[in-house]
């Protein structure tokens, strides 16, 4: 099972938001969580991401065979679980290419691996940009600055 949520209940500021929620997702499946405002969609996302404002009162969450409740936010993100914002922020003056290289090197160092050099990174970036349909020249822009909504999602 890729993601298994069993009987999850959660509160924020003492207010019960999720009550006995269960969901199983196999690898490769796509699920849409839908519902009216205030039904707990954002709470579920924040709980999965590990935001500390939320208290898990019962239930289990297993992601990629690991108990999420035992992992902090950074450990969850290293497994590939993180929140993607509906409206990603722009970061004027921060160029995408060095930003991505610094992010990758931080991840590699955390894994006790050698940092990637600029030449190797440029090669990997060019291949990845092509695979994602991102024009290579756009990688010289500031993070999300002046991007369309679709472009922002691809860069995420």
Functional labels for PLM-detected ranges:
Residues 25-27:
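Conserved hydrophobic segment flanking the Walker A/P-loop of ABC-type ATPase nucleotide-binding domains
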Residues 49:
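Helix-to-loop junction immediately C-terminal to a conserved catalytic motif
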Residues 60-76, 144:
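ABC ATPase NBD Q-loop/coupling interface
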Residues 3-5, 18:
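Conserved structural motif at the start of ABC-family nucleotide-binding domains
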Residues 34-36:
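The feature captures the beta-strand-to-loop junction immediately N-terminal to the Walker
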Residues 89-156:
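ABC-family P-loop ATPase nucleotide-binding domains
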Residues 32, 77-86:
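ABC nucleotide-binding domain signature
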């Amino acid at each position: 099972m890729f993601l298994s949520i069993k009987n999850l209940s959660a509160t924020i500021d003492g207010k019960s938001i999720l009550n006995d929620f269960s969901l199983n997702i196999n690898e490769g499946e796509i699920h849409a969580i839908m519902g009216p405002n205030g039904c707990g969609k954002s709470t579920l996302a924040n709980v999965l991401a590990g935001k500390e404002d939320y208290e898990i009162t019962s239930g289990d969450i297993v992601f990629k065979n690991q108990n999420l409740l035992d992992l902090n936010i950074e450990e969850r993100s290293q497994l590939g679980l993180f929140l993607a914002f509906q409206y990603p922020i722009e970061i004027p003056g921060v160029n995408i290419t060095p930003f991505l290289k610094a992010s990758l090197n931080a991840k590699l160092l955390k894994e006790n691996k050698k940092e990637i050099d600029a030449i190797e990174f440029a090669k990997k970036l060019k291949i990845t940009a092509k695979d994602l349909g991102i024009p290579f020249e756009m990688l010289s822009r500031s993070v999300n600055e002046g991007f369309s909504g679709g472009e922002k999602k691809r860069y995420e």
